Amino acid sequence: MTESTFSQYPRLVLSKGREKSLLRRHPWVFSGAVSRLEGKANLGETIDIVDHQGKWLARGAWSPASQIRARVWTFDKAESIDIAFFTRRLRQAQQWRDWLAKKDGLDSYRLIAGESDGLPGVTIDRFGHFLVLQLLSAGAEYQRAALISALQTCYPDCAIYDRSDVAVRKKEGMALTQGPVTGELPPALLPIEEHGMKLLVDIQGGHKTGYYLDQRDSRLATRRYVENQRVLNCFSYTGGFAVSALMGGCRQVVSVDTSQDALDIARQNVELNQLDLSKAEFVRDDVFKLLRAYREHGEKFDVIIMDPPKFVENKSQLMGACRGYKDINMLAIQLLNPGGILLTFSCSGLMTSDLFQKIIADAAIDAGRDVQFIEQFRQAADHPVIATYPEGLYLKGFACRVM
């Protein structure tokens, strides 16, 4: 590829002194760093990013409606963005996931974790022979055809299903899309296996791509704390933690969620694993309200699992999210018997591990209890975090012993 060919790309010129993050290979360019766009670029189209003197820095995708004006595809000037590019990225990701799948006996895993796999705005989860695709950025959508072609090359025997029906697409001026791309339609509930559990996944209608694969290791870790214990499983979704708790020998597990459909699948998951259904209770309720009601009625638990949805989407919401996390963890701490275990998580990328730990400490003070941090959690290894993109470490959690 010649330099003259590269010059055909529109150029995004950065303001003076705003190239430092790109020199450190961070994959985002924020609106405040942009001086001007030279040439015309459509939504999601490939552009070259240069400093204020015209020095080439990266090649990325243009998104004029987003606070993230450009997401970097490559820091290699010789690399063009085409089917071969996406095939290379997929092969790199495939190598790691194939090793993990063989090592841990996985039939389902995250194949592409966005920026950390060099494909910003692209999420791909594999469930058996189904690949579930989410395109979350303008650049990813613009390259849809090339990406799907690369997927078919790397996974010729897999069906592809699109779950790009997430609200974040609206921020970049894109419509929501969902439906089969290639191959057959996924069944209403697809069985997968995870650490000895059989679990039903709703690819077409479930949260995100159908199941939270990132919590795989945390669900397994739960088993060491639950033998003969009474467990409260908050924001239970389809019951992965509940099934794991029952496999760990818990005395009872109460699963709470606002979705009756999710609770119905959770019940089916307990039955599918031939576990004692009499030890499992399913409650459709708002977790905040129910915890306060439990406190009022003197309910107590030995283990509480707190795995809420994302409380914060942007920095302006961070303070409110901190209050929400503090309130809900304070309530959980108050409901635990002395020596009880709180397994608490945050999936908000803007919530750092240090800040989350401080929130738990503050919640313990407000609850009037002493808390020991005994274990730390993060997303499973099929959700890697590239060193230049710390935002990729979005899931964090702690096991806490409440005195």
From Swiss-Prot:
PUA domain span: 9-88
EC number: 2.1.1.191
One GO molecular-function entry: RNA binding
Localization: Cytoplasm
Catalytic activity field: cytidine(1962) in 23S rRNA + S-adenosyl-L-methionine = 5-methylcytidine(1962) in 23S rRNA + S-adenosyl-L-homocysteine + H(+)
GO cellular component: cytoplasm
Main location: cytoplasm
Role noted for this protein: Specifically methylates the cytosine at position 1962 (m5C1962) of 23S rRNA.
Protein's name in the database: Ribosomal RNA large subunit methyltransferase I
Organism per entry: Salmonella schwarzengrund (strain CVM19633)
